[in-house]
Amino acid sequence: MKSNSVLIPMVVEQHSRGERSYDIYSRLLKERIIFITGTIEDNMASSIVAQMLFLEAESLDKDIFLYINSPGGIITSGMSIYDTMQFIKPDVNTICIGQACSMAAFLLSSGTKGKRSCLPNARIMIHQPLGGYQGQASDIAIHAEEINKMKKKLNKLMSLNTGQSIKKINKDTERDCFLSAHESIKYGLIDLILTQR
């Protein structure tokens, strides 16, 4: 049987009173770096929100760096991250490493303007919300209406993030729309491509 667990590297720091070891993500959190990796769902979103609130409590003036490599995920989970990004005082730098698709692309575009970036070979994909529901016809209709409301809300916010018209966002998100790093700058999803520190 294969295990899905990933070995998390440990970092050992030497101090005058001995050693202290951290998992790599805890150590990076000390540098105000947070990772969104994998599918965005409630447990992951709660962890991201908690980390942002912790970093805000540590310093209101220092930027937070949100590294994203995600295929997207649940809309409500992503919106809890988005709302927290807007709520906290520190600027949130968003950096795509690998991919930012669907909700992850929305979060990438929602970073502080001028501080949204990706690496040269990253890919970004935007599309309309997906939903799957089964049950009575009346329940399916309720869920379809909710998905349409979410689509309108997300497209309006994406328009504000990118500077694109809602009409263009509606058209481009009708199907999966993949963008390279350079195309993402032109579209307004990001502000710069990082090639080196």
From Swiss-Prot:
Keywords: Cytoplasm, Hydrolase, Protease, Serine protease. It is found in: Cytoplasm. GO terms for molecular function: ATP-dependent peptidase activity; ATPase binding; serine-type endopeptidase activity. Its EC number is 3.4.21.92. InterPro entries: ClpP, ClpP/crotonase-like_dom_sf, ClpP/TepA, ClpP_His_AS, ClpP_Ser_AS. Signal peptide: none annotated. Pfam families: CLP_protease (PF00574). It catalyses: Hydrolysis of proteins to small peptides in the presence of ATP and magnesium. alpha-casein is the usual test substrate. In the absence of ATP, only oligopeptides shorter than five residues are hydrolyzed (such as succinyl-Leu-Tyr-|-NHMec, and Leu-Tyr-Leu-|-Tyr-Trp, in which cleavage of the -Tyr-|-Leu- and -Tyr-|-Trp bonds also occurs). The keyword tRNA-binding does not apply. GO terms for biological process: protein quality control for misfolded or incompletely synthesized proteins. The keyword Hydrolase applies. GO terms for cellular component: cytoplasm; endopeptidase Clp complex. The active site is at S102 (nucleophile), H127. Belongs to the peptidase S14 family. Cleaves peptides in various proteins in a process that requires ATP hydrolysis. Has a chymotrypsin-like activity. Plays a major role in the degradation of misfolded proteins. Fourteen ClpP subunits assemble into 2 heptameric rings which stack back to back to give a disk-like structure with a central cavity, resembling the structure of eukaryotic proteasomes. NCBIfam families: clpP (TIGR00493), PRK00277.1 (NF001368), PRK12553.1 (NF009205). This is ATP-dependent Clp protease proteolytic subunit.
